[in-house]
Amino acid sequence: MTAPVRDWNADAYHRVSGPQVAMAAAVLDRLRLRGDETVLDAGCGSGRVTRLLLERLPDGRVIAVDASPDMVARARQELAGDPRADVRRADLAELRLNEGEQVDAVFSNATFHWVPDHAALFARLAAALRRGGRLSAQCGGEGNVAAVHEAALAAAADAGLAARFEGWPRPWNFAGPEQTAQRLRRAGFGDVECWLQGWPVEPDEPRAYLETVCLGPHLERLDAGEHERFLDAVMARLGAHPVLDYVRLNIVARRGGSVDR
Protein backbone atom coordinates (compact mmCIF):
# COMPACT_ATOMS: atom_id res chain seq x y z
CA MET A 1 0.00 0.00 0.00
CA THR A 2 1.47 3.33 -1.09
CA ALA A 3 0.44 6.57 0.59
CA PRO A 4 -0.13 9.73 -1.44
CA VAL A 5 2.99 11.87 -1.36
CA ARG A 6 2.56 14.81 1.00
CA ASP A 7 3.14 18.28 -0.39
CA TRP A 8 5.80 19.27 2.16
CA ASN A 9 7.17 22.80 2.47
CA ALA A 10 10.80 21.73 2.75
CA ASP A 11 12.20 25.18 3.50
CA ALA A 12 9.77 25.65 6.39
CA TYR A 13 10.49 22.14 7.65
CA HIS A 14 14.22 22.78 7.53
CA ARG A 15 13.71 25.88 9.69
CA VAL A 16 11.40 24.44 12.35
CA SER A 17 12.64 20.84 12.63
CA GLY A 18 14.98 21.39 15.57
CA PRO A 19 13.05 18.85 17.67
CA GLN A 20 13.53 16.17 15.01
CA VAL A 21 17.26 16.94 14.91
CA ALA A 22 17.43 16.53 18.70
CA MET A 23 15.54 13.24 18.53
CA ALA A 24 18.00 11.89 15.97
CA ALA A 25 21.12 12.04 18.17
CA ALA A 26 20.50 8.83 20.12
CA VAL A 27 19.29 7.04 16.98
CA LEU A 28 22.59 7.88 15.29
CA ASP A 29 24.52 6.67 18.34
CA ARG A 30 22.81 3.30 18.17
CA LEU A 31 24.20 2.69 14.67
CA ARG A 32 27.69 2.24 16.19
CA LEU A 33 29.41 3.28 12.99
CA ARG A 34 33.11 2.75 12.26
CA GLY A 35 33.10 5.60 9.76
CA ASP A 36 33.63 3.76 6.47
CA GLU A 37 30.17 2.26 5.90
CA THR A 38 27.52 2.91 3.28
CA VAL A 39 24.34 3.94 5.12
CA LEU A 40 20.79 4.36 3.85
CA ASP A 41 19.03 7.42 5.28
CA ALA A 42 15.44 6.25 4.91
CA GLY A 43 13.40 9.45 4.80
CA CYS A 44 16.07 12.14 4.69
CA GLY A 45 13.73 15.13 4.71
CA SER A 46 15.54 18.41 4.10
CA GLY A 47 18.97 16.92 4.83
CA ARG A 48 19.64 18.45 8.26
CA VAL A 49 20.06 15.09 9.96
CA THR A 50 21.76 13.57 6.91
CA ARG A 51 24.53 16.09 7.44
CA LEU A 52 24.96 14.84 11.02
CA LEU A 53 25.09 11.28 9.72
CA LEU A 54 27.81 12.25 7.25
CA GLU A 55 29.89 13.69 10.10
CA ARG A 56 30.11 10.13 11.44
CA LEU A 57 31.19 8.73 8.06
CA PRO A 58 34.49 10.40 7.12
CA ASP A 59 35.35 7.47 4.84
CA GLY A 60 31.82 6.28 4.09
CA ARG A 61 28.82 7.41 2.08
CA VAL A 62 25.08 7.96 2.48
CA ILE A 63 22.26 7.05 0.13
CA ALA A 64 19.56 9.50 1.24
CA VAL A 65 16.02 8.89 0.01
CA ASP A 66 12.71 10.67 0.44
CA ALA A 67 9.34 10.46 -1.30
CA SER A 68 8.73 14.23 -1.36
CA PRO A 69 10.10 16.06 -4.41
CA ASP A 70 10.43 19.29 -2.41
CA MET A 71 12.34 17.53 0.38
CA VAL A 72 14.66 15.85 -2.13
CA ALA A 73 15.40 19.19 -3.80
CA ARG A 74 16.11 20.82 -0.42
CA ALA A 75 18.34 17.92 0.68
CA ARG A 76 20.33 18.14 -2.55
CA GLN A 77 20.81 21.83 -1.90
CA GLU A 78 21.84 21.18 1.72
CA LEU A 79 24.34 18.47 0.77
CA ALA A 80 25.59 19.93 -2.51
CA GLY A 81 29.30 19.48 -3.06
CA ASP A 82 29.66 16.49 -0.73
CA PRO A 83 30.59 13.48 -2.88
CA ARG A 84 29.64 11.12 -0.04
CA ALA A 85 25.94 12.05 -0.35
CA ASP A 86 23.69 10.47 -2.99
CA VAL A 87 20.17 11.92 -2.68
CA ARG A 88 17.38 10.06 -4.45
CA ARG A 89 13.61 10.26 -4.64
CA ALA A 90 12.00 6.97 -3.57
CA ASP A 91 8.91 5.60 -1.83
CA LEU A 92 10.21 3.47 1.05
CA ALA A 93 7.44 0.88 0.73
CA GLU A 94 8.58 0.25 -2.85
CA LEU A 95 12.30 0.90 -2.32
CA ARG A 96 14.70 -0.80 -4.70
CA LEU A 97 18.34 0.17 -4.78
CA ASN A 98 20.42 -0.15 -7.92
CA GLU A 99 21.19 -3.62 -9.25
CA GLY A 100 23.65 -5.34 -6.92
CA GLU A 101 23.64 -2.42 -4.47
CA GLN A 102 23.24 -2.99 -0.72
CA VAL A 103 24.06 -0.92 2.35
CA ASP A 104 25.83 -1.68 5.61
CA ALA A 105 23.25 0.06 7.81
CA VAL A 106 19.86 1.76 7.68
CA PHE A 107 19.08 4.92 9.62
CA SER A 108 15.66 6.57 9.81
CA ASN A 109 14.28 9.44 11.85
CA ALA A 110 10.67 10.70 11.98
CA THR A 111 9.60 8.88 8.81
CA PHE A 112 8.16 5.39 9.26
CA HIS A 113 4.83 6.66 10.64
CA TRP A 114 4.11 8.14 7.20
CA VAL A 115 4.34 4.67 5.60
CA PRO A 116 0.98 2.83 5.86
CA ASP A 117 2.31 -0.69 5.28
CA HIS A 118 5.10 -1.44 7.75
CA ALA A 119 5.35 -5.07 6.65
CA ALA A 120 6.21 -3.95 3.12
CA LEU A 121 8.52 -1.26 4.48
CA PHE A 122 10.56 -3.67 6.59
CA ALA A 123 10.78 -6.18 3.74
CA ARG A 124 12.23 -3.53 1.44
CA LEU A 125 14.71 -2.36 4.09
CA ALA A 126 15.81 -5.94 4.72
CA ALA A 127 16.42 -6.39 1.00
CA ALA A 128 18.53 -3.22 0.94
CA LEU A 129 20.70 -4.33 3.88
CA ARG A 130 23.68 -6.64 3.74
CA ARG A 131 23.45 -9.69 5.98
CA GLY A 132 24.33 -8.60 9.52
CA GLY A 133 23.58 -4.96 8.70
CA ARG A 134 22.06 -2.83 11.43
CA LEU A 135 18.78 -0.88 11.44
CA SER A 136 18.43 2.04 13.84
CA ALA A 137 15.24 4.07 13.56
CA GLN A 138 12.79 6.23 15.44
CA CYS A 139 9.33 7.36 14.39
CA GLY A 140 6.00 8.33 15.84
CA GLY A 141 4.66 5.50 18.01
CA GLU A 142 1.37 4.49 19.57
CA GLY A 143 -0.24 7.56 21.16
CA ASN A 144 1.96 10.06 19.34
CA VAL A 145 0.57 13.64 19.42
CA ALA A 146 -2.86 12.25 20.33
CA ALA A 147 -3.80 15.43 22.18
CA VAL A 148 -2.73 17.54 19.21
CA HIS A 149 -4.95 15.64 16.79
CA GLU A 150 -7.85 15.67 19.25
CA ALA A 151 -7.46 19.45 19.53
CA ALA A 152 -7.26 19.76 15.74
CA LEU A 153 -10.56 17.96 15.21
CA ALA A 154 -12.20 20.03 17.95
CA ALA A 155 -10.78 23.16 16.33
CA ALA A 156 -12.25 22.11 12.99
CA ALA A 157 -15.67 21.99 14.67
CA ASP A 158 -15.02 25.39 16.27
CA ALA A 159 -14.23 26.81 12.83
CA GLY A 160 -17.26 25.25 11.16
CA LEU A 161 -15.11 22.78 9.22
CA ALA A 162 -15.98 19.48 10.90
CA ALA A 163 -17.64 18.10 7.76
CA ARG A 164 -14.27 18.13 5.98
CA PHE A 165 -13.00 15.43 8.35
CA GLU A 166 -15.97 13.05 8.32
CA GLY A 167 -14.79 9.56 7.39
CA TRP A 168 -11.20 10.74 7.12
CA PRO A 169 -8.72 7.84 6.78
CA ARG A 170 -5.90 9.32 8.83
CA PRO A 171 -2.62 9.05 6.93
CA TRP A 172 -0.23 8.15 9.74
CA ASN A 173 0.69 4.78 11.21
CA PHE A 174 1.63 5.13 14.88
CA ALA A 175 2.48 1.51 15.63
CA GLY A 176 3.23 -0.17 18.94
CA PRO A 177 6.47 -1.95 19.85
CA GLU A 178 5.08 -5.50 19.97
CA GLN A 179 3.50 -5.48 16.51
CA THR A 180 6.56 -3.71 15.11
CA ALA A 181 8.90 -6.37 16.52
CA GLN A 182 6.75 -9.10 14.97
CA ARG A 183 6.81 -7.41 11.56
CA LEU A 184 10.57 -6.97 11.71
CA ARG A 185 11.15 -10.65 12.52
CA ARG A 186 8.85 -11.72 9.69
CA ALA A 187 10.86 -9.51 7.33
CA GLY A 188 14.09 -11.30 8.25
CA PHE A 189 15.46 -9.18 11.09
CA GLY A 190 16.93 -10.51 14.32
CA ASP A 191 18.26 -8.99 17.55
CA VAL A 192 15.09 -6.87 17.53
CA GLU A 193 14.44 -4.24 20.20
CA CYS A 194 11.44 -1.90 20.05
CA TRP A 195 10.25 0.48 22.76
CA LEU A 196 8.18 3.61 23.25
CA GLN A 197 9.60 6.84 24.65
CA GLY A 198 7.71 9.98 25.64
CA TRP A 199 9.32 13.11 24.18
CA PRO A 200 7.42 16.34 24.96
CA VAL A 201 8.16 19.05 22.41
CA GLU A 202 7.83 22.79 23.01
CA PRO A 203 8.50 24.31 19.58
CA ASP A 204 10.08 27.74 19.22
CA GLU A 205 7.55 28.71 16.52
CA PRO A 206 4.40 26.83 17.57
CA ARG A 207 2.09 27.93 14.77
CA ALA A 208 4.65 27.41 12.00
CA TYR A 209 5.71 24.09 13.52
CA LEU A 210 2.15 22.78 13.74
CA GLU A 211 1.32 23.97 10.24
CA THR A 212 4.44 22.39 8.73
CA VAL A 213 5.03 19.22 10.75
CA CYS A 214 1.80 18.09 12.42
CA LEU A 215 -1.16 19.51 10.54
CA GLY A 216 -0.19 19.13 6.88
CA PRO A 217 -2.65 16.27 6.32
CA HIS A 218 -5.41 18.29 8.01
CA LEU A 219 -4.72 21.32 5.84
CA GLU A 220 -4.88 19.17 2.70
CA ARG A 221 -8.53 18.49 3.57
CA LEU A 222 -9.32 22.21 3.44
CA ASP A 223 -9.46 24.92 0.81
CA ALA A 224 -6.52 27.32 0.88
CA GLY A 225 -8.80 30.12 2.07
CA GLU A 226 -9.77 28.07 5.13
CA HIS A 227 -6.23 27.37 6.38
CA GLU A 228 -5.79 30.45 8.56
CA ARG A 229 -9.22 30.06 10.16
CA PHE A 230 -8.41 26.46 11.04
CA LEU A 231 -4.93 27.31 12.38
CA ASP A 232 -6.39 30.15 14.46
CA ALA A 233 -8.84 27.68 16.01
CA VAL A 234 -6.08 25.13 16.69
CA MET A 235 -3.93 27.73 18.43
CA ALA A 236 -6.92 28.85 20.50
CA ARG A 237 -7.34 25.24 21.64
CA LEU A 238 -3.65 24.56 22.35
CA GLY A 239 -2.58 27.97 23.65
CA ALA A 240 0.29 30.24 22.64
CA HIS A 241 3.05 28.00 24.02
CA PRO A 242 1.88 24.39 23.72
CA VAL A 243 3.86 21.36 24.80
CA LEU A 244 3.20 18.70 22.20
CA ASP A 245 2.73 15.12 23.37
CA TYR A 246 5.23 13.27 21.19
CA VAL A 247 5.67 9.53 21.71
CA ARG A 248 8.56 7.95 19.83
CA LEU A 249 8.86 4.35 18.70
CA ASN A 250 12.52 3.31 18.85
CA ILE A 251 13.68 0.44 16.66
CA VAL A 252 16.96 -1.47 16.68
CA ALA A 253 17.43 -4.65 14.66
CA ARG A 254 19.95 -6.59 12.61
CA ARG A 255 19.34 -8.17 9.23
CA GLY A 256 19.48 -11.94 9.52
CA GLY A 257 19.64 -14.58 6.80
CA SER A 258 18.51 -14.51 3.20
CA VAL A 259 15.42 -12.51 2.24
CA ASP A 260 13.50 -12.16 -1.00
CA ARG A 261 14.65 -9.22 -3.09
Residue ranges of model-derived segments:
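C-terminal helical/coil "lid" or tail adjacent to the Rossmann-like core of SAM-dependent
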Residues: A187, D191-P242
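Class I SAM-dependent methyltransferase SAM/SAH-binding core
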Residues: L40-A42, S46-L95
